[in-house]
Amino acid sequence: MKVAVIKYNAGNIRSVDYALKRLGVEAVVTSDKEVLKAADKVIFPGVGEAETTMLHLKESGMDHFIKELRQPVLGICLGMQLMCRFSEEGNVDCLGIFDTDVKRFAPRKHEEKVPHMGWNTISCLKSDLFKGFTRDEFVYFVHSYYVPVSEFTAAETDYIRPFSAALHKDNFYATQFHPEKSGEAGERIIKNFLEL
């Protein structure tokens, strides 16, 4: 199986590559569109800022390319947010794969800190990504923006308000949390993605 990780102006590529190696998978980290198109699975990671990253994707033509991929694609954190229609982070149009917007957390109480950083459980698991997953397992989040619950929600969690922990539409899967930093539970999610 050929697995490719999209290389672009964003962080956490190394931790995704390391998580794949722990599963015995040698992935290619690349921005080469032909290599990405030929891969069996594509991972679209991201840590960074939506406006700057979308600008980079547009300049490289990667914005249209990602939307045209037909194999299973997994967006992680910022990767998930960029798959949405619009982000309040920089008020930028995104890829529009998921017809929903990314919003900034608005804390109602002093103890509700932004960013949402740390371990949380997820529920309403509606995707093969979560095969063998139980409600009491924790995954790791680091984000200041969220995607509201919608028809594309494949898993949800609650911090300040309920929101989408994962999205799914056709061949596109996405997690707001970092499976590559979520221990055994996260490894199982990556393994499930590779088995799709």
From Swiss-Prot:
Its EC number is 4.3.2.10, 3.5.1.2. It is found in: Cytoplasm. Gene3D superfamilies: 3.40.50.880. GO terms for biological process: L-histidine biosynthetic process. GO terms for molecular function: glutaminase activity; imidazoleglycerol-phosphate synthase activity; lyase activity. Its main location: cytoplasm. Keywords: Amino-acid biosynthesis, Cytoplasm, Glutamine amidotransferase, Histidine biosynthesis, Hydrolase, Lyase. Residues 2-196 form the Glutamine amidotransferase type-1 domain. The active site is at 77 (nucleophile), 178, 180. Pfam families: GATase. Pathway: Amino-acid biosynthesis; L-histidine biosynthesis; L-histidine from 5-phospho-alpha-D-ribose 1-diphosphate: step 5/9. It catalyses: 5-[(5-phospho-1-deoxy-D-ribulos-1-ylimino)methylamino]-1-(5-phospho-beta-D-ribosyl)imidazole-4-carboxamide + L-glutamine = D-erythro-1-(imidazol-4-yl)glycerol 3-phosphate + 5-amino-1-(5-phospho-beta-D-ribosyl)imidazole-4-carboxamide + L-glutamate + H(+); L-glutamine + H2O = L-glutamate + NH4(+). Heterodimer of HisH and HisF. This is Imidazole glycerol phosphate synthase subunit HisH. It comes from Bacteroides fragilis (strain ATCC 25285 / DSM 2151 / CCUG 4856 / JCM 11019 / LMG 10263 / NCTC 9343 / Onslow / VPI 2553 / EN-2). The gene is hisH.
